[in-house]
A protein has these predicted regions:
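Short acidic-glycine-tyrosine-enriched beta hairpin
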Residues: 93-110
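A short hydrophobic beta-strand segment most commonly corresponding to one strand
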Residues: 79, 106, 120-139
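Short histidine-centered beta-strand/loop micro-motifs
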Residues: 47-51, 60, 69-74, 91, ...
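Short, conserved beta-strand element in jelly-roll/cupin
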Residues: 61-63, 72-89, 128-131
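Short beta-strand His + acidic residue motifs that chelate non-heme Fe in jelly-roll/DSBH
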Residues: 70-71, 89-90, 107, 113-119, ...
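A short, N-terminal "cap"/entry segment at the start of jelly-roll beta-barrel domains
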Residues: 1-56, 69, 140-170
Length: 170
């Protein structure tokens, strides 16, 4: 059977992201996907593309000026590759890297970071992490005080999503 990549709609909550990743990891079959996402006027989205027990890949979109709060993933090594736009990455001491299209950053587990979408156009990132986050590896995101922080929370600078009508990456 020929596998055909299809557009995947974004997950709009942290719970939905992890539910989809768990479901994808359970399939045990090859997965094909498109690097395609609707662009944003405001907010951010995550689209789980593929997952196994040991790895995940997501397409992330941030509106221009979008950001998140300083945090770490204590059980997950992960990397970002900028596909469109640009982002400034920060650690606890300040600026760590300014990245544009086709540039990336690797963050070992426990590394504190945050980033800010610096281009006028929306930021599109490919995020790959290992291992797949699961409830037994809780908490999966912590703030600088070591306290759990939810990805789609006000504390993590989450705002409501507004899509750009008819505008897509990929």
């Amino acid at each position: 059977m020929l596998l055909t990549p299809e557009f995947v709609s974004p997950a709009l909550s942290t719970k939905e992201i992890y539910d989809r990743q768990r479901s994808l990891a359970e399939t045990r079959d090859p997965t094909v996907f498109k690097l395609s996402a609707q662009l944003l006027e405001q907010g951010r989205t995550d689209t789980p593309l593929c997952a196994t027990e040991g790895m995940t890949a997501r397409l992330k979109v941030y509106a221009s000026g979008g950001e998140n709060a300083l945090h770490a993933h204590p059980h997950e090594d992960h990397m970002f590759i900028v596909l469109q736009g640009s982002a400034q990455f920060f650690d606890a001491d300040g600026t760590m890297a300014q990245l544009g299209a086709n540039e990336g950053i690797m963050l070992p587990k426990g590394s504190y970071y945050r980033f800010h979408a610096t281009s006028d156009e929306p930021l599109v990132l490919l995020r790959v992490g290992t291992p797949n986050q699961s409830p037994k590896l809780s908490p999966n995101r912590i703030d600088p005080k070591g306290e759990p922080i939810v990805g789609d929370s006000k504390e993590n600078k989450s705002v409501s999503v507004r899509f750009r009508d008819g505008e897509y990456f990929g």
